[in-house]
């Protein structure tokens, strides 16, 4: 959702100020995110990654509060509404959006299901950067302005790096459990020590890229001042990632997610100056 907010701000700054498709883009992003989350919970439950001994937050499936049948119905409902909202966006973006919309919904499933689930084969970070950063920002911007440029792709990549912070926290917390269930993540390959450094540098790189994709909107000094809160906050969260262990890391999930919102709001504020 933060990605789309950021894209809308950039599009409005460049003349793409149409609120109806902007709101529909937000709705589509929320539905796609919800679909991905529910499918991921279902997949982790089926594989055994989520169980009564898991370090992560309590899951309704594991506790028995929600049945498999209910989850499947929820997935069907979410996908159906998501598809309809996506179809409505074709009015503004053209039929070229259809294959990409279907791809987004497909990735929501392939992220944790299928013969080669992305999150189980060290491709989770790549998927997050692409489909929670580059794709939503690029196509929201395209729908509103009818153009794509390198600046907006850089903006999408930067947001993808920030959104990836949440996945890194998850994978650091579940490093031992993931190995037990043959779930291969970047933490499993490179080690938590290395990925904690990536966690620190992701938002720094994202803010650095801002000097490029915001150059037509503000001067370097304005952007340098604007990103100070983001930089301070991300360093604080990074320190906590190195300090917290086990279930303590659950407290960082919301804090890591907040980085994306802060980054998006930073862009929004600068565009309003």
Question: Can you say where each PLM-predicted feature lies in the sequence?
Answer:
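Small-residue-rich segments of transmembrane alpha-helices in multi-pass membrane proteins
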Residues: 1-7, 126-141, 188-192, 253-267
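Acidic (Asp/Glu-rich) catalytic motifs at the cytosolic membrane interface
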Residues: 28-55, 165-187
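Intramembrane alpha-helical segments
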Residues: 57-150
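C-terminal ends of transmembrane helices
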Residues: 37-41, 106-119, 167, 171, ...
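Multi-pass membrane catalytic core of lipid/isoprenoid biosynthesis enzymes
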Residues: 52-95, 183-218, 257-258, 263
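Extended hydrophobic alpha-helices typical of membrane-associated regions
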Residues: 217-273
